[in-house]
Every structure is written in C-alpha cells, then in structure tokens.
Amino acid sequence: MEMILSISLCLTTLITLLLLRRFLKRTATKVNLPPSPWRLPVIGNLHQLSLHPHRSLRSLSLRYGPLMLLHFGRVPILVVSSGEAAQEVLKTHDHKFANRPRSKAVHGLMNGGRDVVFAPYGEYWRQMKSVCILNLLTNKMVESFEKVREDEVNAMIEKLEKASSSSSSENLSELFITLPSDVTSRVALGRKHSEDETARDLKKRVRQIMELLGEFPIGEYVPILAWIDGIRGFNNKIKEVSRGFSDLMDKVVQEHLEASNDKADFVDILLSIEKDKNSGFQVQRNDIKFMILDMFIGGTSTTSTLLEWTMTELIRSPKSMKKLQDEIRSTIRPHGSYIKEKEVENMKYLKAVIKEVLRLHPSLPMILPRLLSEDVKVKGYNIAAGTEVIINAWAIQRDTAIWGPDAEEFKPERHLDSGLDYHGKNLNYIPFGSGRRICPGINLALGLAEVTVANLVGRFDWRVEAGPNGDQPDLTEAIGIDVCRKFPLIAFPSSVV
C-alpha cells in the first residue's frame, strides 16, 4: 500500500513539474508577444472584423499599435500597419516571411499552388517566377504588345465618342473591366474575349475564381464550424469552378498546339518552353494553365480597379482634372489624335495622379497573406513559426505620421518630387507589395492604365449626374479581395475634338 502511495506521489509530482515547466515556458514566451485585443473563446478576434477588414484592422492598430497579434479562430495573425514594421517583415526577414498560407480555395482552384502567386516558397516558385519574368514580363515583351493596347483603347474611345455625340452617359466601370480583359486575352491567348466565346467563358471563370479566393472559409480557422462552408456550397463551388476553368484551358492549349500562327502569345511562349528540354527547368502542361490564370487575375483586376478609382478621384477634384487636361492637351499633336505611350512617358502630372490613386486605393488593400516559416523577432517581439502575416498597405499609405494631416485627401502634387517608385523600396508606399513576393506584372498594369487615362482625360471633358453627393461620385467600396467601387461609375463624356 505504501509503495502504491509512493509511486502515485512520484507520478503526481512529476506531472506537476512538467505542467509547471510548460506553463512557465509559455508565460515567458508570451511576455514578448505583440499587443493583442481581448479575444473570445473559439472564434478569437473574428468578431472584430467588418465587411471591409482593411478598415477595421486599421482602427484596431490605432489602439494597439502598428504591430499587433490577432487570432482568427485557432490561427495566429500578425497584422502590420506601418512602414517601419513592414521594413522588418518585407526586408530584414523577407525570406522567413516569403511563404503562403495553405487554404482550401488555393488548393482546389490553383492545383495546390502550381502558379506563381500562390506557390509555396521554394525552388518550384523560384523557377516559375523566373520563367514568368524572363519570358512574359520583360520590358521588351511588354513593349511588343503596344499595338494591342492601342487597338483596344481606341475601340473604347470610339464607344465614348458615340456616347458624346448623343449626349448619353456611359458605364465606365463596365468599360474598365472590358478593356484590360480584352488586352490580356489577346496577349495571353491570341483572341479577344468580347468577340470569342471561349475567351468570354474564360473571363467568367476567372471572375468566379477571384470571388472564391476573396471569400472567408470559416472552417479553416474554426474547424468545428466547417459544416457552414459545406452548407453554403463553398466546397462544391470550388470543385465546379476549378473543373470548368481546367476544361476551358485544355481547349485553349489544344487549339494552340494545332494552330500554325506566326504571332506568339503567352500560351505559345509557354508551350515552346515546355518543349525545350534544355531550358534547365521543365514546365509542365498543367502549370501553363495556372500561369495564364495569374496573368488574367493580375492583368485585369489591378488595371480595372486603378482606372475606376482614377476617374472617380479626378471627377471629384476639378482642379486636378484641369491640371492634368492642360498637361495632356498641350502634348497632343494634332489636337484630338490618339496619345501614344511614348508621349505619356514625359507626363509628370499624369504619373503623379496614378501614384496618388494607388496610394489611396491599392488594388489589394491588404497584401496577399504570408506565412512565417521559422521563429523570428520583429521589433523586439517573439513571433512563432506558422503565424500568418497581413500587411495592411491601405493603412500604411494613409498613415498621417508619414503622409501628413491631409493623408486622406487626393493630392497628386505630393508625388511630383517624391522620388517614390513602385518597387517597394520605400515601405511607406507598397501598392504592389515588396520583397520576394512583389507583383511581377507592374509594368504591364501601369502601361495600359497610363495610356488609357491620358486618352480619356485628354480627349473628353467629364461630368456625372447630381446625386446624394452633389455632382461628385461617391467613394463607397465594394466587398472583395480587390476593392473596387460598390456602385458603377456612370459618367457623361463630352468630346473636345
């Protein structure tokens, strides 16, 4: 009996010591964790998110600081809301933060991350990014498609001329979706989506993929609520959309294999790389589909959102509109002719306008999440491996400590002599991200946006119908991964030719 009691006492003491050690270890670690709002059991801080998370996260950061730790259910989330904090994440420790979180949507829609944007950080991602940059997104390649951009911008201008002659309004939001879609479709597939059934179907599938990527699958953060994703059809949607996209791309690739066309589009280029056994990296047929998908997502969404917000802000700011019109119209020779990309290169105020729009309205207000691969210290805080990271670019680019008390105002003049570029060197301005995961298609998006705005503003005067905000379009944001306007931008063009 005494032996049993002794053994029980020893076991109890051992278990107590082990639990105490674990508790002390966890407590010591927690001492250096970033500030955190109080969280609820099971759901963590999910109740503190609004339909516009970039706004609610900014509000929390104003209270808890530019580096804070939240929990979305069981998942720790590091939220970065200042350029100084972003410096450590995107520069100092970039290689540790370069991975992507695994998600059901990415796994199902992107074949487990076989593209460039969502691929896990590693050799495959490095090789795929290299193939993309060296073969599809070089300056020479972007310049080679200038005629495509000119054709499509001119087609849009013709529609606006007709609206002007009949004094009717035009849905600019719709035009700004069609324009980059047609350009990307011709560049990537060799066909125009508005004139080709397969390309139209592909555009529809890409939009569905973006919508699914922007949804919030509660089951990934709170496993006991995974049944909700099933009931609302999220899992079935992923399977259906993925299958539809894959079938369409199989058809596109097969048509390219059978065609004898001297004009090489992106699919042709990738197929030639696939056939080249001496390229050093073997591109698989399946990989081609998802590289093209990246081109559509980046080439259409970023540009359409940028154009929509640019015209919104210019119409709201008559002084800025007049200043830009003066710059552009003094350049046009002969008056009213198409403004070419070479002419746009020297338009300083136009470039300042685009920079300011991207500051206030980055296409992705929160840079695509990253995943920490190993334990690290950030600004003196302990951050554990497996933590997901959200960089709130929208909050960083409206920081009054950096941009001044007028940070919320549209003021292109602040960029005329700023020296800022789009490559993420200054972490207070990161509309396309920074570091290893920076958007590789910057030149593709900007080239089309700049020449489009130049022709829209140079060749037309603009007005909107008076509404609740008078004669100014409102700034209400839609809900989604890419934050466009909630309501379409309807405006009246008046030709000045």
Curated annotation (Swiss-Prot):
CDD domains: CYP71-like
Membrane disposition: Single-pass membrane protein
Enzymatic reactions: (E)-(indol-3-yl)acetaldehyde oxime = (indol-3-yl)acetonitrile + H2O
Source organism superkingdom: Eukaryota
Chief localisation class: membrane
Signal peptide feature range: none
Membrane spanning stretches: 2-20
EC number: 4.8.1.3
PROSITE patterns reported in the protein's UniProt record: CYTOCHROME_P450
Cellular component, GO, one term: membrane
Induction comment: By Pseudomonas syringae pv. tomato DC3000, Botrytis cinerea, flagellin, BTH and UV-C. Repressed by the transcription factors WRKY18 and WRKY40 upon infection with Golovinomyces orontii.
Function: Involved in the biosynthesis of the indole-derived phytoalexin camalexin. Catalyzes the conversion of indole-3-acetaldoxime to indole-3-acetonitrile. Required for resistance to A.brassicicola and B.cinerea.
Record's protein name: Indoleacetaldoxime dehydratase
Species in which this protein is naturally found: Arabidopsis thaliana
